[in-house]
Amino acid sequence: MKFIDEITLNVKAGKGGNGMIAFRREAHVDRGGPSGGDGGNGGNIYFVGDLGKNTLLHLYLQKSIVGNNGVNGGRKNLYGAAGEDKFIKVPVGTVVYEGQKVIADIVEEKPYLIAKGGRGGRGNTKFKTAKNKAPRISENGLPGESKKLTLVLKVLADVGFVGKPSAGKSTLLSVISNAKPTIADYDFTTLVPQLGLVKYFDNSFVVADLPGLIKGAHQGKGLGIRFLKHIERCKVIANVIDFGDENKNPLQDYQEIRNELKLYNLNLEEKDEVIVANKKDQECFEKKLEEFSKHYPNKKIIAISALKQENLDKLKEALWQSVKNTKDIVFELSEDEEVFINFEADFNVVHLGEGQYLVEGPKIHHFYQRIPLNTHDNLMRFNLILKKMGVWDELIKQGIQIGDSVKIYDYEFVWGNE
């Protein structure tokens, strides 16, 4: 299956159902009152974490998700049914962005609300008052939330294996875990992150073999920055270094890898680290390890041979101790800024010339969507709201005359005395 770890996706929750204008017209019911029911709420869209998924391919092909609309209200005060919620499975470890804001970090197998359905409109029964016992007033259902999202899969593993190509990461993964990665004697055998479960006595933890890094990876060289992001989620970095090749310099390899991690994200520098000195079965190993240890006497270094399966229990113990003592990494959700609604400034009046005026603005648009302008009572309610907001005062201030035209989205009327 193709590995897709970053996609853009449009989501639109369901629209609320419209409220109904209706009156009781039944035999033996004198002066039947309003009986229009409310519309149902639009369906929400949820993302659900799924440990069985490891790619965003299914959503990459889908491109967009549209929620279910609420049903319109009916006669006899019948409420419209709410739109059925949609639950979309995504891999655990997926971070959901709207622009630069993190709106969800999918770290558990549970639903996360992504887009909320629109509220259903009220039917005319809800507008009955002592003064107006037969209202011809209703509301449209509101649109559901619409968002353009970026989904980024950051592999959810406790330990991330990093290192140069052909350092032996895939072989190591295959001998300490249940994973069966591709193993070959050439660079970039691992093309996508490979996960494996490591058991240590009664404990277990997840390791990820990440594609080999080369100098300039943070700028996209090799398999580059695309896979560096997967290390962000790992609690512990296991830096696998080849100490068994006469032509390789473990000290230089280590410094280059650390530098790439530092240049990509300074926080990676602060992660707990275990240096895995691989290929201890080779003749040059001890000499290279001694030289390396002189430069880094305080580093946690575990000497192993993945090929000969030597010293693996000691490595498992070191990794487990690091995992156990490190907190889970969760991406903080962006806090919504507090919004203060100022009705006086929430519209704009534009004089187009030749007796034509345009009124627009977010709050104007909200009420325009909410109130169906199909009855006298609804029109009166809409006009009263505009008057209270100060729209009429602004039109008069700009010099509107009787007979001039006022356009509010698709609604147009002629200015009169009232």
Swiss-Prot record:
Q: What class of enzyme is it?
A: hydrolase
For this protein, the record's CDD domains field holds:
Obg
UniProt GO MF annotations? GTP binding; GTPase activity; magnesium ion binding
Cofactor(s) of this protein: Mg(2+)
Instruction: List locations, semicolon-separated.
Output: Cytoplasm
The record's InterPro entries line, in alphabetical order, gives: G_OBG, GTP-bd, GTP-bd_Obg/CgtA, GTP-bd_prot_GTP1/OBG_C_sf, GTP1-OBG_CS, GTP1_OBG_dom, GTP1_OBG_dom_sf, OBG_GTPase
Binding of Mg(2+), residues = 170, 190
First-listed, main subcellular location of the protein, grouped into a coarse class? cytoplasm
List the record's Gene Ontology CC terms alphabetically. Answer: cytoplasm
Instruction: Check the record and name the Pfam families matching this protein.
Output: DUF1967, GTP1_OBG, MMR_HSR1
Which GO terms of type biological process are on file? ribosome biogenesis
Does the record carry Amino-acid biosynthesis as a key word? no
- Per the UniProt entry, the Enzyme Commission number(s) are 3.6.5.-
Entry similarity comment? Belongs to the TRAFAC class OBG-HflX-like GTPase superfamily. OBG GTPase family.
Function statement: An essential GTPase which binds GTP, GDP and possibly (p)ppGpp with moderate affinity, with high nucleotide exchange rates and a fairly low GTP hydrolysis rate. Plays a role in control of the cell cycle, stress response, ribosome biogenesis and in those bacteria that undergo differentiation, in morphogenesis control.
> What is the designated name of this protein?
GTPase Obg
Originating organism: Mycoplasmopsis pulmonis (strain UAB CTIP)
Taxonomic lineage is: Bacteria, Bacillati, Mycoplasmatota, Mycoplasmoidales, Metamycoplasmataceae
> Which gene does this sequence derive from?
obg
